[in-house]
Regions:
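C-terminal juxtamembrane segment of a hydrophobic transmembrane alpha-helix
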Residues: 1-15
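Extracellular/periplasmic head regions of type IV pilus-like filament subunits
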Residues: 39-87
Length: 115
């Protein structure tokens, strides 16, 4: 029955989208922890380019697990994914940091990747 195939396909797409969103959140959390431990790498206030940390760096330094590609298990989403941190004015003693996650998998690219 065609209906069953369509339902399964929609379910799989939803599961994949959830996996991508989870990876994006995990990447952001890993980058947050990385920069807590490496504050010297944080960008200057209002530097528009910010500082970039690669997913592979986060994996190599044990902040992040290997991210298997949900669409193709023989690939992963590690090599082209990264996080950019930018720094706005300090708020009291706290730094106002913004994290932009770029997750790149075989059939998915975060909207914040640009280009």
């Amino acid at each position: 029955s065609t209906l069953a195939v369509v339902s399964v396909s929609k379910y799989l797409n939803k599961a994949r989208n959830t996996a991508y969103k989870d990876y994006e959140k995990t990447l952001e959390g890993a980058a947050t922890n990385y920069f807590l431990d490496h504050t010297g790498l944080l960008p200057e206030i209002n530097d528009p380019n910010g500082t970039n940390v690669l997913a592979t760096t986060l994996i190599n330094e044990d902040y992040l697990e290997n991210m298997k590609d949900p669409t193709n298990k023989s690939f992963n989403c590690n090599n082209n994914s990264y996080v950019i941190v930018t720094r706005k004015d300090n708020v009291g003693f706290n730094m106002d940091l913004e994290y932009r996650v770029c997750l790149v998998c075989s059939k998915y690219k975060s909207s914040s990747c640009g280009g």
